[in-house]
Amino acid sequence: MSKFKSLLLMFGTLILLSGCSNVEVFNAKGPVASSQKFLIIYSIIFMLVIVAVVLTMFAIFIFKYSYNKNSETGKMHHNSLIETIWFVVPIIIVIALSIPTVKTLYDYEKPPESKEDPMVVYAVSAGYKWFFAYPEQKVETVNTLTIPKNRPVVFKLQAMDTMTSFWIPQLGGQKYAMTGMTMNWTLQADETGTFRGRNSNFNGEGFSRQTFKVHSVDQSEFDSWVKDAKSKKTLSQDEFDKQLLPSTPNKELTFSGTHMAFVDPAADPEYIFYAYKRYNYVQKDPNFVAEKDLYKDVTDKPQKPARKVQITNANYKRHGMKPMILGNNDPYDNEFKKEEDHNSKEMEKISKSAKDENASKFGSKADNDHGGGH
């Protein structure tokens, strides 16, 4: 009995202490996260009511209709009312859950309503790090992000190695970043503060350290931050390539200029492999290689010249897209934005085509998997 009490006390304490944790998803600081919070709470309450009704009916049937020696064998009869209820009620439940879910999912793709024009930030994952390039401000950060409050931010998500998932729980849900693609994801912070961001898609041994901080500040403070960032060291191609290596420690860094001056990761997905060669980095399995030997051959200085702008993504030529190259002295003007919009539309077409193709393959596979003499 004492053992049972100890276990009960332990689990009870864990449950109570869990209430003291900061559940970021329920601590929304932006319009997208707020709509997700409503949907989650709505779904939980709805399903709790269903569970409560089912368990109550289950208990009633057990105690009221339990078998005893005086029980008579029941006879089944057709009952239109009961049959209607068990068909109609589940349909109503599915509709009640589907309508707000579908509406919210489609609303995610629309920029939050704001008087301010959206700010564009290129968010690139590589080497278990996050790189944030500000094309208009001409600055770039690593593992840290600063955004103005009450202004929508259009994140253009790209991956240079493994597929990752960009997630800031207090601002909105996650969206995948994939090699050879640029995916748009618009978020907004309604309050000032510091929030946590991370990669939510397991992608290797460095997954746990692929995190970043998000600083939401007033516009005046953001302008001051940009001014200070422009006084930092200019991001060179050598420095950028070195930061792409998983062997380079994860640090919060700020640079003047951006990597957009010399590479568009979506247009040149093979770029990172050349960066590996420049520093003699060879990928090794940490399960079979001692930790001290993983990066022993990596050099401090590049052994090859910097890579020139190239297009190794066949979709770019196929869809008439240009690499998004923006020099540090070039204006982020309407002409460049026009090319951005064109690329975004073509990327959406590519994504939709891939989804349709996968759905078609899945459908044909399901047909072939049916039983019979095949």
Curated annotation (Swiss-Prot):
GO MF term list: copper ion binding; cytochrome bo3 ubiquinol oxidase activity; cytochrome-c oxidase activity; oxidoreductase activity, acting on diphenols and related substances as donors, oxygen as acceptor
Signal peptide: 1-19
Record-linked PANTHER family: CYTOCHROME BO(3) UBIQUINOL OXIDASE SUBUNIT 2, CYTOCHROME C OXIDASE, SUBUNIT II
Pfam families: COX2, COX2_TM
Function: Catalyzes quinol oxidation with the concomitant reduction of oxygen to water. Subunit II transfers the electrons from a quinol to the binuclear center of the catalytic subunit I.
Enzyme class: oxidoreductase
Protein EC: 1.10.3.-
GO biological process, one term: ATP synthesis coupled electron transport
Catalysed reactions, semicolon-separated: 2 a quinol + O2 = 2 a quinone + 2 H2O
Spans annotated as Disordered: 321-374
Keywords, comma-separated and alphabetical: Cell membrane, Electron transport, Lipoprotein, Membrane, Oxidoreductase, Palmitate, Respiratory chain, Signal, Transmembrane, Transmembrane helix, Transport
Name listed for the protein in its UniProt record: Probable quinol oxidase subunit 2
InterPro entries, per the entry: CcO_II, CcO_II-like_C, Cupredoxin, CuRO_UO_II, Cyt_c_oxidase_su2_TM_dom, Cyt_c_oxidase_su2_TM_sf, QoxA
Lipidation (N-palmitoyl cysteine): 20
GO cellular component: plasma membrane
Record keyword NADP present: no
